[in-house]
Design a protein with these regions (language model features):
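Positively charged n-region of N-terminal signal peptides that target proteins for export
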Residues: 1-4
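Enrichment for repetitive, rod-forming helical segments
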Residues: 9-13, 64, 144, 187
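Hydrophobic membrane-insertion alpha-helices, especially the h-region
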Residues: 6-22
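A structural signal for short, hydrophobic/glycine-enriched beta-strand patches
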Residues: 18-168
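Alpha-helical structural elements
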Residues: 15, 26, 179-180
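A transmembrane-helix-recognition feature enriched in membrane-embedded lipid enzymes
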Residues: 166-197
Length: 198
């Protein structure tokens, strides 16, 4: 019982600290250092295009494909897979190179539902495409769910995030992302401290 109370107390303190940080004037300058990771765009067996955004992410995934970094793209996410596929096709990616997972509603489900598909195809390395604020949790989740696969991650084009609208959207999403990181750590055991890439 004492251990349970200790865990609850720690979680409450973590959430309070997170909310304090979100209201701090330091947050707009600090979140990129907390959430963003250094992009890595080496060759991989596949590209994973995470859903949740229909413009910058598919454009970046198509660019990586055209650059020859991977021979195929896996789209995951139930809300916008059709729009993302359409954008990939319009960007010159052949339909035969696209595989769709259309049921995932969360980042954790992205990884869990893709796992059997990647295993079936013998994927041993994958390059994840997502937004800057989502990088840390996305990579942590995929490493947690598929420790035998070598994952690298890259962000969408930074130009959008430098616009006034982009900065506002990024800050809003980053606020929510910090809460999700704490939740994923507490509930699913997904630690945001990442393993080094190998």
């Amino acid at each position: 019982m004492r251990r349970i109370l200790t865990i609850i107390a720690v979680l409450v303190l973590m959430f309070l600290a997170a909310f304090w940080f979100l209201e701090s004037p330091l947050f707009p300058r600090a979140w990129p250092h907390v959430l963003m990771l250094k992009s890595s765009e080496g060759r991989a067996d596949c590209i994973i295009l995470l859903g949740g955004e229909q413009e910058a992410r598919p454009v970046k995934a198509a660019e990586l494909y055209r650059d020859g970094l991977a021979p195929r793209i896996f789209i995951t996410g139930d809300g916008d897979f059709a729009a993302n596929k359409k954008r990939l096709l319009a960007s010159g990616v052949p339909e035969a190179a696209i595989t769709i997972e259309e049921s995932a509603k969360t980042t954790l489900q992205n990884a869990r539902l893709l796992r059997p598909m990647l295993e079936k195809e013998g994927v041993r390395s994958a390059l994840i495409v997502t937004s800057p604020f989502h990088m840390r949790r996305a990579l942590a989740v995929f490493q947690h769910e598929m420790p035998r696969v070598r994952f690298t991650i890259t962000q969408t084009s930074p130009e959008y995030w430098r616009t006034k609208k982009g900065r506002k959207n990024a800050q809003s999403n980053a606020s929510l992302e910090l809460v999700k990181i704490v939740y994923y750590w507490a509930v699913y055991g997904v630690k945001p401290l990442l393993k080094p890439e190998t």
